[in-house]
Amino acid sequence: MGARSGARGALLLALLLCWDPRLSQAGTDSGSEVLPDSFPSAPAEPLPYFLQEPQDAYIVKNKPVELRCRAFPATQIYFKCNGEWVSQNDHVTQEGLDEATGLRVREVQIEVSRQQVEELFGLEDYWCQCVAWSSAGTTKSRRAYVRIAYLRKNFDQEPLGKEVPLDHEVLLQCRPPEGVPVAEVEWLKNEDVIDPTQDTNFLLTIDHNLIIRQARLSDTANYTCVAKNIVAKRRSTTATVIVYVNGGWSSWAEWSPCSNRCGRGWQKRTRTCTNPAPLNGGAFCEGQAFQKTACTTICPVDGAWTEWSKWSACSTECAHWRSRECMAPPPQNGGRDCSGTLLDSKNCTDGLCMQNKKTLSDPNSHLLEASGDAALYAGLVVAIFVVVAILMAVGVVVYRRNCRDFDTDITDSSAALTGGFHPVNFKTARPSNPQLLHPSVPPDLTASAGIYRGPVYALQDSTDKIPMTNSPLLDPLPSLKVKVYSSSTTGSGPGLADGADLLGVLPPGTYPSDFARDTHFLHLRSASLGSQQLLGLPRDPGSSVSGTFGCLGGRLSIPGTGVSLLVPNGAIPQGKFYEMYLLINKAESTLPLSEGTQTVLSPSVTCGPTGLLLCRPVILTMPHCAEVSARDWIFQLKTQAHQGHWEEVVTLDEETLNTPCYCQLEPRACHILLDQLGTYVFTGESYSRSAVKRLQLAVFAPALCTSLEYSLRVYCLEDTPVALKEVLELERTLGGYLVEEPKPLMFKDSYHNLRLSLHDLPHAHWRSKLLAKYQEIPFYHIWSGSQKALHCTFTLERHSLASTELTCKICVRQVEGEGQIFQLHTTLAETPAGSLDTLCSAPGSTVTTQLGPYAFKIPLSIRQKICNSLDAPNSRGNDWRMLAQKLSMDRYLNYFATKASPTGVILDLWEALQQDDGDLNSLASALEEMGKSEMLVAVATDGDC
C-alpha cells in the first residue's frame, strides 16, 4: 500500500511540474481565439545519466548501510528494492547544477537496515536499484546487493605440524571458515607475514594452501593461517614445521699402524657423524663409527755370517786370505746387517817373507783403491760423452746448410699437382658386394646404409708442371644442394622424393640415389632445429607438419602416427603469431642410448621452434609401447639438450613443484603439458625384471617373384603407429606386401631372446636355405628400443618356377615367454591389391592443422563458465580438484594448483585426450556427478547442437 501511494505521489508531482498557470489563464480569457499552428519548442532533454550508481554493501553487526546514486538530468530519483518502491519519506534528496553542462544534478540516498535484509525470504540476496526520470524517459541503475557480513569461528581445515627432511617439499593445508564476503587468507611464519614475491621458496596456491618448495633449516618455524574479512579476523592453530637433518658419515680416516711390530696384531680406522651432523632430531648415522681389522707385520730378520771359506794359496805378497758372506740368513724386513769383515788374511810364510806390504785384512786400503778406480772410470765416460756430443752438433749444422741450398733448386711436383692438399683415405667401392649384384638376396635391414660418395678425379700426369702463383689454391666451393631420398637397401631402388634446398647447389653425383638414406636427411634436419627460421627446415610430409597460430590456438597432427601438439586458447600472447612445427625424428642416432634395463618407449618427437614465450602449457601427445598394467615401470621423460646429450625432465610419481611439466599416462599414449618446446622421448626402466613391452609382428613378402628364390621378412616392431608406418614405407620401396595382419606380442624384461622358426614347409616343392632350425634376435636389440626395423629373413627356394603356391607356419616367441604363430598361404603369381595402401591409410584423421575454435570440442563460452565455477575452492570440495579426480587427472594436483586457472589446464588436457573420438558427454557426466547442474545444462545443450 505504501508503495502505491508513493508512486501516485510521484506521478502527481510530475504533472504539477509540467503545468503552467499562464497557459490556463490564457485559455480561460480567450477561449474563442484560434490556437496558433505551432509553438516554440525547447531543445529535447536527454535520458538521465547516472554519475554514481549504488554499490554492493555489507552490513557489519547492526550498523545500517547507505546506498546513494547521482544522475543528471533528472527530475526525480527513487530507489526500488526487491521489486518494491522505497517510501518517499526514506529518501534523502539533494539537488545542484553541473558546472560543465548547467543541467540539474540530483542525488538520492537511502539506508538499509539489518532487519530489512533479514526479513527477505527466498534464495535471492537483498538488492536495490535507482530509477531516474527526465522528460525523455527513465533510466535504471545497476543492482546493488546488500548482504549481512559474517565470518565463522572454526576453520574447515587447519594446518598440521610436520617434521620433514632437508630439501623436501612441505604442504600445509588451510581452508578458511565460511564468511561473507569471502575471507582473505594470509600465512604467518613466526608472526611475520609470508610474501611469496620476496621469498620464492614459498608458494600460495589458489585453494589457500602453503607450499614450501625445498625445506631449509631456516624454515623451521611456527606457521599460522589467518583468515579475515570486514567483520573479523580468525587465526588457525599454529602448525610447527621442523626441518631436520639426518646425520651422515664423514670419509674414513687412514688405517692406524699395526699394533704389533712383529707378527699378528690389529689396526683400526674411524669416521665421524659430521657430514652433516644430525640436527633438529634428525637420525644419527647408521653403522659403526670405527672399523677394526687384523694385520700381520713380517718380523725383521737380522743377518748372519756364513762359514769362512778355505784359505787361498799363498800370494806373491806372502799372504793368503779367506772370505765369508752375510747370507745365513741375509738381513730381511729391516733386520740388522752383519757386523765384522768380509775378508780375513794372514802371512803364509811364518814371517820369513822380506816384503813389507799392507795386509789384505786392512779394509781401509781396499776402500781407497776401489774409490780411485771408480773416479778413473767416471772421468773416461764423461770425456767420451762430451766428444760425441760435439761431433753430433757439428754434423747437424753441416746437414742443415746443405739441405737449405739443395731445397732452393727443387720443385715439389706432387704439391703443385694437388695444390698443397693431399688425398686422405680414398677407398673405391667393392663391386663384389653381393647385395649390389644380386637384388633378389634379401638385405640385412638392421644395418644402416648412409654412405657418402664424392666425385672421383683422375690424377694428372706427373710430368706436367703447374706453376705456383698467389691465386687461391682452391676455387670457392659451389653452393650445396642436398637431395633427400627415402630408405632403400637394394642397388636398384630409386629415391622417392626430393627434399627442400637446405644450403644451395651440389655438383651432380654427390648423392647416388641407390645409397641415399633418411639418416643423412635427419642429421641435417636436427642440426637446423635451433633456428627459428622455418623456411629452410627440410620437411618429410609423412613425418612432419607445421602451421601458424595466434592467441586462439589450434592443433598440429601427423596423420597415422598418433603424434600431435595442442596449442590451447591463450597459450600464445595476444597479437602475436608463431609458426610452429612438429616432426618425428627417424634416425636411430636421434634416440638416447639405453643404460641397464632402460628402454625407449616412444618415438623421438621435436616440437618447435624452441625459446617461444608461452602463456600457458601446450600438450604434446606421443604413442608408447609400455604395458602399463604391469605396474613395474619407472617412467621418465627426457629432452635433448643443445649439445646433443639427453637429460631427464621428470620421473613419474616423483614430481615436485620445480618439475617443469606434467605427464598424463594412458594405456597407449602419454600426454605431456610443456612450458618449453624441444625434442622429447618417453623412456622406461624395469625395477623387478617383470616389466612388459608391447610389440607387433609383421610378415612381408615380395609382391612379384620371377626367380626360384623367395624371401619372407618377419619384422619385430614396437606397438606404435609410427613404427609400423616406417616399415610400410620401407617395404613399399622394396616391392614387398603385407602377407597377414600384424599380431601383438608381449615382450618381458627377462633377458631371453626372440626366437623365430619356420614349420610345415612342403618339401616336395620348396626348401629352406636356412641351415639352423631357428633364428634369434638378441634380447637387448629389442629391449633397448633404439634399433629400428629389426627383422629376420627366411630365404626359400622352389624346385621349379611352376611352384606358385606356398603354405607354411612361422612361429615367433620369446624364449620362456609368449609367442604368436602365422599361418601363411600365398600365391606367387598374384599380387594382393592395396595391402600396403590399406594400412598406410589406416584409421585416424588426415587433417594435419586445425586453427582456432575448430581444434577444440568445448566452445569458448562454455569453457569460461566452467572455469569461473570451478576455479575458486569451496568447502564442499566440488571444485577443480573433484573435476580432476572424475577425469582421472589427479595423479599430482599440485601442478594444477600452481596455475592461474587450474580448471583451464585440466580442460586443455581433456581436449588432448579426446582428440579422436571424444565428445562432450564424458565431461557432462563428470559435471553431473559433481552436482554442477547449471554447467550441465550448457554442456548438454551444446552437445545436442
UniProtKB/Swiss-Prot annotation:
Lineage: superkingdom: Eukaryota
Cytoplasmic face residues: 399-945
An example Gene Ontology molecular-function term: netrin receptor activity
Residue ranges occupied by any TSP type-1 domain in the UniProt entry: 246-300, 302-354
Transmembrane segment boundaries: 378-398
Membrane topology: Single-pass type I membrane protein
Tissue: Highly expressed in brain. Also expressed at lower level in developing lung, cartilage, kidney and hematopoietic and immune tissues.
Chain ranges of the ZU5 domain: 543-686
GO cellular component: a single term: plasma membrane
SUPFAM superfamilies according to UniProt: DEATH domain, Immunoglobulin, TSP-1 type 1 repeat
Gene Ontology terms describing biological process: angiogenesis; anterior/posterior axon guidance; apoptotic process; negative regulation of extrinsic apoptotic signaling pathway in absence of ligand; negative regulation of neuron apoptotic process; positive regulation of phosphatidylinositol 3-kinase/protein kinase B signal transduction
Cystine connections: 69-130, 81-128, 174-225, 258-295, 262-299, 273-285, 314-348, 318-353, 326-338
Stretches assigned to the Extracellular side: 27-377
Family (UniProt): Belongs to the unc-5 family.
Additional record remark: Down-regulated in multiple cancers including colorectal, breast, ovary, uterus, stomach, lung, or kidney cancers.
The protein's name: Netrin receptor UNC5B
Organism: Homo sapiens (Human)
Species classification: Eukaryota, Metazoa, Chordata, Craniata, Vertebrata
Gene transcribed to yield this protein: UNC5B
